[in-house]
Amino acid sequence: WGMLAVLLVFTQLTIFAVTLYLHRSQAHRGVDFHPVIAHFFRFWTWLTTSMITREWVAIHRKHHAKVETEEDPHSPQTKGIGQVFWRGVELYREARAQRADIEQYGKGAPNDWIERHLYTPHANAGPIALLVVNSVLFGLPGIALWAIQMAWIPFWAAGVVNGLGHWWGYRNFESADTSTNLTPWALWIGGEELHNNHHAFPSSARFSMRRWELDIGWIAIRCLQALGLAKVLRVAPSLDIRPNIAV
């Protein structure tokens, strides 16, 4: 049970680093975090995913700008659900190789000393360091823990959210794309399950839009806000709306 608890804590921290920091804060500027919290999220992303903030932000912004077109980096409508669900990480690598897009869409991402000298040029050093730490602390089970951590974002974010989130589920809004909400209680993927709501109001720090929807990422933001560690910049109005309103 101890290892399962560690796995749950580590993987959920990674999910929160992606949804709160990379997505809601860096890509869409819906929320700002205290520098200590922001840097912790950036460090944890480097340690557990090897993803570079600027690249992630650029690819996601391009997804919104070119949604459901041939230029969308990961639309199941153009690439096929199987391709996005099972090869999401490969599509991400292909997208980050488009350096002109990274320049165009990645503006405003961190570019401080540690980003230029560690997080960007040595992105793969994070997971390697994590493998060493896991092995020292937990032995052979630590290697299994590391393997699951490495697969967590490629499966749940690149596969489930980017794939199923544009293919299956319910819609509150008739947005100009095929985005869907996978479940009203968004507890497992940091709130990213409410993908149609997000596409309707991309810059909103809160993804839940109806009284019976729950966004665990928003709960985390509110807790950090209560501690003076987060500042909400944009939030969509909470409306109990009828389904399929056009936006």
Identify the role of each PLM range:
Residues 106-114, 168-194, 198-201:
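Active-site-proximal inter-transmembrane loops
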Residues 1-160, 164, 204-247:
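Non-catalytic, topology-defining segments of multipass membrane proteins
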